[in-house]
Curated annotation (Swiss-Prot):
Main location group: cytoplasm
Official protein name in the record: Adenine phosphoribosyltransferase
Top-level taxon: Bacteria
Native source species: Chromobacterium violaceum (strain ATCC 12472 / DSM 30191 / JCM 1249 / CCUG 213 / NBRC 12614 / NCIMB 9131 / NCTC 9757 / MK)
EC number: 2.4.2.7
Gene of this entry: apt
Pathway: Purine metabolism; AMP biosynthesis via salvage pathway; AMP from adenine: step 1/1
Length: 193
């Protein structure tokens, strides 16, 4: 859990960062399948000012916390997570799709918005008591985030908080994460999916 004394960026909507960054997220209808409104963060990442602003939001949120690792979910969580880990001067743990890691792994299966999958991490990626921030670009159904959380907990890590750029509240993933005992911080949300 994040310290109640370290919440300088708690209400981003009041500061209008959320609306500004949302303007740099592209919506792609019917991708990867019919009926899905894909939220594409690449325009936000391509602009150095918006990318810096996004990372600074997370840095200011976590810089006063004792964080040992940032764990990023495959694949866009790697982009945000590795930069955040660098800025916080801590290690980075990739949580990958099944079959992508070369060493001994631990695996967790989960349901996606449009199918089933599994994620895994190296068995030596963290140690008991490590304080970890878990990050991805988007929380839809919450399956990927919860799978990452379960992996880290299984390895004995203390997951301080989950973070994402976007939450899709209608799909219930944010609530699933919170109901699962994990605090969730997101920069913006979109109605509809």
């Amino acid at each position: 859990m994040i310290s109640k004394y370290n919440r300088p960026m708690e209400n981003l909507s009041n500061l209008d960062y959320s609306s500004y960054l949302k303007g740099w997220i592209r919506t792609v209808p019917n991708w990867p399948q019919q009926g899905v409104m894909f939220r594409d963060i690449t325009p936000l990442l391509q602009n150095p000012k918006t990318f810096r602003m996004l990372i600074d939001i997370y840095v200011h949120r976590y810089m006063m916390e004792k964080v040992d690792l940032v764990a990023g979910l495959d694949a866009r969580g790697f982009i945000i997570g590795s930069v955040l880990a660098y800025e916080l001067n801590v290690g980075f743990v990739p949580i990958r799709k099944k079959g992508k890691l070369p060493f001994t792994t631990v695996e967790e299966e989960y349901e996606l918005e449009y199918g089933n999958a599994a994620v895994e991490m190296h068995t030596d990626a963290c140690k008991p008591g490590d304080r970890v921030i878990l990050i991805d670009d988007l929380v839809a159904t919450g399956g990927t985030m919860m799978a990452g959380y379960k992996l880290l907990k299984r390895m004995g890590a203390d997951v301080l908080e989950a973070a994402a750029i976007i939450e899709l509240p209608e799909l219930g993933g944010g609530q699933l994460v919170r109901d699962g005992g994990l605090d969730l911080f997101t920069v913006c949300s979109y109605e509809g999916h």
